[in-house]
Design a protein with these regions (language model features):
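S-adenosylmethionine
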Residues: 1-200
Length: 200
């Protein structure tokens, strides 16, 4: 759903194991760059292994805490991919233990962590750029409520992703859409900087 074009600078802030990074790199067709970051050495090594195995020249991998602001990236990114840590409730079909281990308190902590990351990374999006916020959960607190938070606390505004969706998902809001039985569920939203910051 990201509007990635040749020559773009793409930042993937929570990237491991790298699937979105490499899809973005393919979309660039060799004319642009993907900066692929994650928190731990283990995760960045996973991305590096996949990068080397698939021979991507336009991907740079860095170990970086998404909660730490990188001033060198402010307003420089064409497309920001923010597939953030979440409860994973949309993939219980293949990770059945999630429903037995996840608590209400943990759900709240994950939603708060997402907001903390979003409060840092949205600043990297250049005017006219795009941020994709996504999770693999259907928890309203991690999805719809965080979209509301973005709109109230940043100059980003929602943009339509309908043209990228299959017909059966068009004209529906992401947080109340049902997916077919025995499939995984996910949430995605796209935002671009508004002409001026919101007023309080």
């Amino acid at each position: 759903i990201a509007d990635i074009n040749e020559g773009d600078f793409v930042l993937d802030v929570c990237a491991a194991p790298g699937g979105k990074t490499f899809h973005a790199a393919d979309r660039l067709k060799g004319a642009g760059k993907v900066l692929s970051r994650d928190l731990t050495e283990y995760k960045t090594e996973l991305i590096e292994e996949n990068k080397d195995r698939m021979h991507y020249e336009n991907v740079e991998v860095q170990q970086w805490d998404a909660l730490e602001e990188d001033e060198s990236l402010l307003e420089s990114v064409d497309v920001l991919l923010a597939d953030l840590p979440c409860s994973g409730l949309g993939i219980m079909g293949r990770k059945n233990d999630i429903k037995y281990q996840m608590t209400e308190e943990q759900l709240g902590e994950l939603a708060a962590l997402q907001r903390q990351i979003l409060s840092v990374v949205w600043k990297y999006v250049k005017p006219g750029g795009q941020m994709i916020f996504s999770t693999c959960t259907l928890n309203k607190g991690e999805n719809a409520e965080n979209i509301k938070w973005i709109e109230e606390n940043t100059p980003l505004h929602l943009v339509s992703i309908e043209e990228y969706l299959p017909q059966n998902l068009k004209n529906r809001t992401a947080w109340n859409s049902r997916t077919p039985p025995r499939t995984n569920a996910a949430f995605s939203a796209a935002g671009s900087p508004a002409a001026s910051p919101p007023t309080s």
